[in-house]
Amino acid sequence: MQIQFHLYNTLSRTKEVFNPQDQANVKMYVCGPTVYYNPHIGNSRSGVVYDLLYRIVIKIFGEKAVKYVRNITDVDDKIIDRAALLGVTIDELTDKVTKEFHKNMAYLGCMLPSIEPKATKHIDVMIAIIERLIAKDHAYIADNHVYFDVLSAPNYTELSNRNLEEMFEGVHVENSKTKKNPQDFVLWKPAKQNESANMNFESPWGLGRPGWHIECSAMSYKYLGENFDIHGGGADLIFPHHTNEIAQSRCAFPSSTYAKYWVHNGFLTVNGEKMSKSLGNFITVRDLMDKQIQGEVVRLFLLSSHYRRPLDYNDKAIEDAKKTLNYWYRAIENINVQKIDLPHDFMQSLLDDMNTPLAVKIINDYAKGVFISKTEEERQLNASAIITCANFIGLMNKTPNEWFNSGVDELYVNELVNKRLEAKKQKNWLLADQIRNQLLEEKIILEDRPDGTTIWRKE
């Protein structure tokens, strides 16, 4: 039976059955980071959401049939400004932040994309597309800039579903006096005086660099062609970035529809407020790593809400995710779990526009099943379902022992446990209680067994 994957398409504003142009060559493009600052937890939501989408598409069509491109934006005004602020070179900054991004994605359990192109390596493709746009009267040169003529693009507002005046209301428009229309956006900008040479490139319009929007059009065209299946990114990219991508790509290649399905994940707030440096609530993934919050906890938190809905980061949400994972790991403890076929109800939840809250509930139900099972066979079946489902969404990649004792000095704990056992033999109950309380303060829980032994676990 043909698997039907329903995916919400921002372009049509409906859930559609995902039907790629070629089932043997499924193409997916996701906007990656601009590498000027360590990625924050909002960026990480996008990484995890599209990692899950990639896993689902692979499950349906096979790994060899799917090409996933996620770019690195390493040419941008923000990069120039931050490098100058830090007193480092452009390359030093972009290399450092790119490496940090890769560490963050590994920490969150994200698979590598098929291709990860850098904008600076594709300037020639950008120039070629800009030349096509000029030749077709969709772009023009003014004051050493190349601009895209927004009014020349059919259906410019299709993705955002707003009229042109609404879209630009309150938006700061640069160089409005030199443009044909205030809404026109830059395709190529000239180099500024005293600017770093490695952030500017030779072009038919002089030394300069590309605008942001042309970069993704060029890299998606290079690796996926004029038409591809999925384009993903955060909801904040719908306008202007994705709107402008569609306009310039369709105008450069008139027979192209560009991306067929547009997928956008919702915003992430911190304690109910928009994340910003001025509010002091700007949280990077590195901050979470330094707090020794396990990556699986953050990943489950990011999957706990439907990807299109807003998600609020707070201590309780992280603690809830940790408790859930503890529950799942406890459920499979001391059981010989085996990989089984993905349960039908679990897979159906993901095929319904990646309904991860329902998927998580189903895993919880299997965990409950372990604890109420009346036979060992039932326990094993439920535990095997837990690990199979959790692994599919990128979770539970450790043994229960590794999970509960992560970051613990086992030698130190075992020494104290043995010291406590000796104290109990000597009926030194005061010392035994002191050791238990000391370990409890360090979030180590002791469990005395009827046979006289003591086992321990991290809280």
From Swiss-Prot:
An MF annotation (GO) of this entry: cysteine-tRNA ligase activity
SUPFAM superfamilies xrefs: Anticodon-binding domain of a subclass of class I aminoacyl-tRNA synthetases, Nucleotidylyl transferase
Cofactor or coenzyme needed: Zn(2+)
Amino-acid positions noted as binding Zn(2+) in the UniProt annotation, renumbered to this chain: C31, C216, H241, E245
Protein EC: 6.1.1.16
Signal peptide: none
Family: Belongs to the class-I aminoacyl-tRNA synthetase family.
Oligomer status and interactors: Monomer.
HAMAP family for the chain: Cys_tRNA_synth
Name this polypeptide is given: Cysteine--tRNA ligase
Organism field: Rickettsia africae (strain ESF-5)
Gene: cysS
